[in-house]
A protein has these predicted regions:
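Glycine-rich NAD(P)-binding loop of the Rossmann-fold in SDR/ketoreductase-type enzymes
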Residues: 35, 71-79, 118, 122, ...
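NAD(P)-dependent short-chain dehydrogenase/reductase
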Residues: 110, 133-186, 191, 226-228
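Conserved Rossmann-fold NAD(P)-dependent oxidoreductase catalytic core, especially the SDR/UDP-sugar
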Residues: 81-121
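Conserved catalytic-site region of short-chain dehydrogenase/reductase
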Residues: 62, 98-111, 123-129, 150-154
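C-terminal substrate-binding subdomain of Rossmann-fold SDR/epimerase-dehydratase oxidoreductases
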Residues: 17, 170-256
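N-terminal Rossmann NAD(P)H-binding glycine-rich loop of SDR-like oxidoreductase domains
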Residues: 3-22
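Rossmann-fold cofactor-recognition segment
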Residues: 28-38
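NAD(P)H-binding glycine-rich loop region in Rossmannoid oxidoreductase-like domains
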Residues: 38-75
Length: 256
């Protein structure tokens, strides 16, 4: 199997590349600017014919997206349209995996299935859903993976996990520990597990939308507390919202 991958230098991308290499697949990473269609054309032209393309390239941190929404749309939405346009022209038979997010949904007290209404909880979710729409409209052999709350030891700030690690190392934990969204509930999954799921999807090559998550609800305060043996005096700040996936559709596919 011959694989093309965008976003290979990111946390999930590096893990996927390692796993792809271990399985003996050939791959070619995209190292250009996804906003530049000629960079994508050059990449596809200079590579072997792709059986699979895994599209991870994106601006992800919600704070960065809020600060520069125009750039985020250019990368996450227009960049995706650029990719599918080139693939339609030069590799229309390949299977495309588009990495989206659980942020395309609104907060819900119930588990969120792929059939739930779309109402992005963040600007990041809005940019990724726009990418979904553009990809679905312009490419047939497409699988969209809506990844919920990813964490990994190699992440850097401003993501939650590395931010909390840094605070736990630097702050006096005998004092009150202020935490925005402490009462919010998320569906956390390690990037290693996410990469394994993507590889399983790659083996099946389904079309359609799949939630990629653990299916388990965890309060952010509990996730943070699990990172230290010190009993934290957590002070909750900000609003509460809930994003927990129903993963029945995913489990049914990968367990067939």
């Amino acid at each position: 199997m011959k694989i093309g991958i965008t976003g290979a230098s990111g946390v999930l991308g590096r893990i996927l590349v390692d796993k792809i290499s271990q399985q003996g697949y050939e791959y070619k990473s995209f190292e250009g600017d996804i906003r530049n269609i000629s960079d994508i054309q050059d990449w596809v032209d200079s590579s072997f014919p792709f059986d699979v393309v895994i599209h991870l390239a994106a601006i992800v941190p919600t704070s960065q997206v809020r600060e520069n929404l125009g750039q985020a749309f250019d990368v996450n939405s227009v960049g995706t349209k650029n990719l599918v346009d080139v693939l339609n022209e030069k590799a229309s038979n390949c299977w495309l995996f588009y990495s989206s997010t659980g942020h395309v949904y609104k907060s819900s007290n119930e588990e969120i299935s792929e059939e739930n209404d779309i109402e992005p909880i963040s600007e990041y979710g809005l940019t990724k859903y726009a990418g979904e729409v553009l990809a679905k409209k312009n490419f047939k052999n497409l699988c969209i993976g809506r990844i919920f709350s990813m964490y990994h030891d190699t992440q850097n700030p401003p993501f939650l996990y590395p931010n909390i690690k840094k605070r736990l190392e630097e702050e006096d934990l005998t004092k009150f520990f202020e935490l925005y969204g402490a009462e919010s509930v998320r569906d956390f999954l390690n990037a290693e597990d996410i990469a394994d799921i993507i590889l399983k999807l790659m083996g099946k090559k389904p079309q359609g939308v799949y939630n990629i998550a653990s299916g388990k609800a965890t309060k952010i305060r509990d996730f943070v507390q699990s990172m230290t043996e010190e009993k934290l005096k957590i002070v909750s700040l900000g609003n509460k919202d809930i994003l927990v996936a129903n993963i029945d559709k995913l489990n049914k596919l990968i367990n067939e």
